[in-house]
Amino acid sequence: MASISVDSNESIDKALRRFNKAVQADGILTEARRREHYEKPSVKRKRKEAARLRKLQKMAREANN
């Protein structure tokens, strides 16, 4: 769980920005979006395989440069 401590002289906007960065770093929103609807195991496997292939292609492109 993301948490921050707000100083007495810190603006709310600055604290909110820090909180949003912490939430993004923890991956809370992406996890919530992923769990919003049930995902069948076959769909989950396909999604993971597609992500793995994208990662391999990206690594291959970077290795060629």
UniProtKB/Swiss-Prot annotation:
Gene3D superfamilies in UniProt: Ribosomal protein S8
Region (Disordered), start-end ranges: 33-65
One Pfam match: Ribosomal_S21
InterPro entries: Ribosomal_bS21, Ribosomal_bS21_sf
Cellular-component GO terms for this entry: ribonucleoprotein complex; ribosome
Keywords for the protein's UniProt record, in alphabetical order: Ribonucleoprotein, Ribosomal protein
Biological process per Gene Ontology, one example term: translation
GO MF entries: structural constituent of ribosome
Biased composition, class Basic residues, residue ranges: 43-58
Regions of compositional bias (Basic and acidic residues) in chain numbering: 33-42
NCBIfam families given in the database record: S21p (TIGR00030)
Family membership: Belongs to the bacterial ribosomal protein bS21 family.
Name of the protein: Small ribosomal subunit protein bS21
Classification of source organism: Bacteria, Bacillati, Chloroflexota, Chloroflexia, Herpetosiphonales
Gene: rpsU
